[in-house]
Amino acid sequence: MSNIMEVKGKRVIVTGAAFGIGKAMTESFLESGAKVVIVDINEEALKQTAGDLNVEYITADVSSEAAIKNIISTSNSSMGGIDIFCSNAGVGGESGLLNTTEEDWLNIWGVNVMSHIYAAKHSLPQMLEQESGYFVNTASAAGLLTQIGAAGYSVTKAAAVSFAEWLAITYGKKGIGVSCLCPQGVRTSMVEDAPGIVSALVGIDGIMEPADVASDVINAIESDQFLIAPHEKVLDYIKMKAQDYDRWIEGMQSLQTQLLDSFPEAEDMFK
């Protein structure tokens, strides 16, 4: 079954929409003729974006299942249903293992993984009833290739990719489309505010503009494409990793050494 979905006229939720990729997605959906409700935890920035784009907004912490249920209920009331759920909210994390706390792990797991699970759990019943629906789950190239130094980010983004795969396998023949967004460096506050070593790493193949990533998302939905890899080199890296895992590990170890030689002040991030 093909789950190609024309975006025009569709009812869309975008989380993490106050800035960056989420805001750019919202703009692209609106330009394509969709109706959008935007969500973010940053109420001030969210209000500004909602006013600029003339859309409804919901302030929420997407790591909360109750909050996701309210987002869906409120959006159903205002839009008359949901066709596309873009689970885009995410948090970074530059620490390694030894300096992270239980609270750190629970926070990043809640936002980067559980928000996707809650969105699917509570959107699927109505999507299955209407025999159509689409999820765009934002992960990262780090979920496919691991990000040096960032234990929590790498682990949770890998889990996000795995959940998106499971969702596509389980519901793809039941009218539900799934795309998993896995960019490298994108010009967002998360990248621009990151330590120098992180910016150097994620920008190794160039920094993309959010609008270009958002355009890739629209194209993926309208062609029922699972993996969205805006940076084409990511696909080459995946092939290299699959062909010789040990060589790939050795290459990543060498890259880590090179980065630490250039940014010795960041050594604690790699423990």
Residue ranges and their predicted role:
Residues 44, 60-70, 102:
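The beta1-alpha1 cofactor-binding region of Rossmann-like NAD(H)/NADP(H)-dependent oxidoreductases
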Residues 120, 156:
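Active-site helix of classical SDR
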Residues 32, 145, 166-176:
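Active-site-adjacent segment of SDR/Rossmann-fold oxidoreductases
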Residues 11, 18-19:
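Conserved glycine-rich cofactor-binding loop
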Residues 96-97, 104-109:
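Substrate-binding pocket helix/loop in short-chain dehydrogenase/reductase
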Residues 140:
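Residue(s) in the substrate-gating loop at a strand-loop-helix junction
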Residues 199, 204-207, 211-271:
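C-terminal tail/cap regions
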